[in-house]
């Protein structure tokens, strides 16, 4: 059997590795490097990939593509700002997708990434002496479904059979924990070239269980580079009244110089930036030069807000895992940007311990991917290793009043299964529409709809009598199945929703952030909806009493009917004062009416305690809307 490889398809650099003698090993490329720049250049019919492409970038900026991972699987309206910073032309493609124009040809990001993968696999095949066809490819933990699918398609375009797409922090944890025997709680801090993930895992007895994950999808080493680029350009503009960012060749040279300075500042207190002949004076055509010295202190000042953004995902991951910093046994640094001294200081400050640097931050992810490939191929040297991941956002259904009823909460381990009982909102309601939602906000409209389906053929019965059993089932592949069954009739309907993490990363972060920022407003809205729902339920109960006690005194029926009508109008008005007034009046009239019927022996109180009796303890008091 041909060996399967593990590939870290990075924003800045990529790495390929394979299992050798029970251990993962990095495969060097044709140039002898352990990492390959994720850079592709087009020169006529020739395609250059890796270091050779990077070397000629300044002379060929419009056709040298880098950081393409930031565009893969994303919509145009998500990447406009990043596109504007690129020396090459990024534009809107079919259906709001992203395309890169090179020499009059429109390329999808997947095509460009496939060139990097093809280079990695070709070099590795030559080193191993066998053709490689199977691979595990890693992605950031917060990559959405379209980004994961696009990454997989890039592998397929490169001629690979993609065995699995796994999360980068989980892969890094595999590499770290492969030979460790004890039980540990590990925080993986992954700051790469374009993305930032924090994942907390529990390791022990061959089990790698993800407890929580958080991240910032617009934070990576490239953002630190761009701050240096902007500083250099603004300094030059102040001195010469010329913006270098408008000159593609000059911009490419600035980007390269910024990255080099950032790397220098990881080991030195200052870096000299010298770019002779950076451009020409537009009037005199005399050459212009850029000479600057960037200190580490100035670099940290330029990136202060980026460094602050590093803190929040760490704090969120700890909170979601219900852990304190003292519960973390080890901190693993992944990604080249973790070499920035200020980043290391922040991590140590947040967790209270020195990060474990036994794992190479550039290679750990690829090594872990090779371990996963070995597991899939049944490598006996690995023994029994189990990975347990989580769902990143809450899953639920929309109920009466436009609210979400949570079914499976954020950071629940998968596979997972949950069943709840719901009921109908109206008398003789023939069907219900199930709106499956994902998100952290209490109102359905503020969350992502994953799909809708209808359960029809419910037998005629009073509101609240139907018992609709809704089951959410997420399998190990992340595929969500939702089933709804009316227990009286046995009528059943279902929907399968593939890849439930279909939100783009910015949507995930926005939902969590807005949930925190709008907690007070959400609470008020939720309380308002609950008051309206309570009054409407009481109105339905009053109507049922009138139907079941037709022989009651006319004045008593008229009084209750008037109170019920007022309640209906108050619910429609959504006016808090009217709702409270109508609630008090209807409660009083209903109590008087039912007491009179009991005394007269003309009827039993039907459902007077419907919302608190033991019989209804398993029924959630949040009714569905009627299906259209």
Curated annotation (Swiss-Prot):
Q: Where is the composition biased (Low complexity)?
A: 596-612
* Disulfide bridge partners, by residue number: none
**Keyword ATP-binding among record annotations:** yes
Using the UniProt annotation, give all residue ranges assigned to the region (Disordered): 545-628
Kindly name one Pfam family recorded for this protein: HSP70
Basic and acidic residues bias locations: 555-591, 614-628
A Gene Ontology molecular function term for this protein is: ATP-dependent protein folding chaperone
| Record InterPro entries | ATPase_NBD (IPR043129), Chaperone_DnaK (IPR012725), Heat_shock_70_CS (IPR018181), HSP70_peptide-bd_sf (IPR029047), Hsp_70_fam (IPR013126)
Any idea which UniProt keywords this protein has?
A: ATP-binding, Chaperone, Nucleotide-binding, Phosphoprotein, Stress response
Q: Has keyword Chaperone? A: yes
Q: Using the record's annotations, give every residue carrying the modification Phosphothreonine.
A: 195
Induction note: By stress conditions e.g. heat shock.
The function of this protein is:
Acts as a chaperone.
The entry sums up its family as follows: Belongs to the heat shock protein 70 family.
Q: Which NCBIfam families match?
A: PRK00290.1 (NF001413), prok_dnaK (TIGR02350)
Q: What protein name applies here?
A: Chaperone protein DnaK
Q: Which gene encodes it?
A: dnaK
């Amino acid at each position: 059997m041909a060996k399967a490889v593990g590939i870290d398809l990075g924003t800045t650099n990529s790495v390929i590795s394979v299992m050798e003698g029970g251990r993962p090993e990095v495969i060097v490329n044709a140039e002898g490097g352990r990492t390959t720049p994720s850079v592709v250049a087009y020169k006529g019919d020739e395609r250059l990939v890796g270091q050779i492409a990077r070397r000629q970038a300044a002379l060929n900026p419009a056709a040298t593509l880098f950081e393409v991972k930031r565009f893969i699987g994303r919509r145009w309206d998500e990447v406009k700002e990043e596109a504007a910073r690129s020396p090459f032309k990024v534009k809107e493609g079919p259906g709001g997708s992203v395309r890169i124009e090179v020499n009059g040809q429109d390329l999808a990001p997947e095509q460009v990434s496939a060139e990097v993968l093809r280079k990695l696999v070709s070099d590795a095949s030559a080193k191993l002496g066998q053709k490689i066809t199977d691979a595990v490819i890693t992605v950031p933990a917060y990559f959405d479904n379209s980004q994961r699918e696009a990454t997989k398609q890039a592998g397929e375009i490169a001629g690979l059979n993609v065995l699995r797409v796994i999360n980068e922090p989980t892969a890094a944890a595999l590499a770290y924990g492969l030979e460790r025997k004890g039980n540990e709680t590990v925080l993986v801090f992954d700051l790469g070239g374009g993305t930032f993930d924090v994942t907390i895992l529990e390791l022990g007895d061959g089990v790698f269980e993800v407890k929580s994950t958080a991240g910032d999808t617009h934070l990576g080493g490239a953002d630190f580079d761009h701050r240096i680029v902007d500083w250099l350009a603004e300094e030059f503009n102040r001195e010469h009244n010329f913006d270098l960012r408008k000159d593609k060749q000059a911009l490419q040279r600035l980007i390269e110089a910024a990255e080099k300075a950032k790397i220098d500042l990881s080991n030195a207190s200052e870096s000299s930036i010298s770019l002779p002949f950076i451009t020409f004076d537009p009037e005199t055509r005399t050459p212009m030069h850029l000479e600057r010295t960037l200190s580490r202190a100035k670099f940290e000042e330029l990136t202060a807000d980026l460094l602050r953004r590093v803190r929040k995902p760490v704090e969120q991951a700890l909170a979601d895992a219900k852990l304190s910093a003292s519960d973390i046994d080890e901190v693993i640094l992944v990604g080249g940007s973790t070499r920035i001294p200020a980043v290391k200081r922040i991590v140590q400050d947040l967790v209270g311990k020195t990060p474990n640097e036994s794992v190479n931050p550039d290679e750990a992810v690829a090594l872990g991917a090779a371990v996963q490939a070995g597991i899939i191929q049944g490598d006996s040297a690995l023994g029994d290793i189990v990975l347990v991941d989580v769902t990143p956002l809450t899953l639920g259904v929309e109920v009466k009043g436009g609210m979400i009823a949570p079914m499976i909460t954020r950071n629940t381990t998968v596979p997972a299964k949950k069943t709840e009982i719901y009921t109908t909102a109206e008398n003789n309601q023939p069907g219900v529409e199930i709106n499956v939602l994902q998100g952290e906000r209490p109102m359905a409209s503020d969350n992502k709809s994953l799909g809708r389906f209808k359960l029809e053929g419910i037998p005629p019965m009073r509101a609240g009598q139907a018992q609709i059993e809704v089951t959410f089932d997420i399998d190990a592949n992340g595929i969500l199945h939702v089933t709804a069954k009316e227990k009286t009739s046995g009528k059943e309907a279902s929907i399968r929703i593939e890849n439930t993490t279909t939100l783009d990363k910015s949507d995930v972060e926005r939902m969590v952030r807005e949930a925190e920022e709008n907690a007070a407003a959400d609470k008020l809205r939720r309380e308002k909806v609950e008051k309206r729902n309570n009054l409407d339920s009481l109105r339905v109960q009053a109507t049922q009493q009138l139907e079941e006690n037709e022989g009651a005194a006319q004045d008593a029926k008229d009084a209750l009917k008037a109170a019920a009508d007022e309640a209906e109008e108050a619910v429609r008005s959504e006016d808090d004062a009217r709702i409270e007034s109508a609630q008090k009046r209807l409660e009083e009239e209903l109590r008087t009416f039912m007491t009179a019927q009991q005394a007269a022996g003309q009827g039993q109180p039907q459902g007077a305690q419907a919302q608190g009796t033991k019989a209804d303890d398993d029924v959630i008091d949040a009714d569905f809307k009627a299906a259209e």
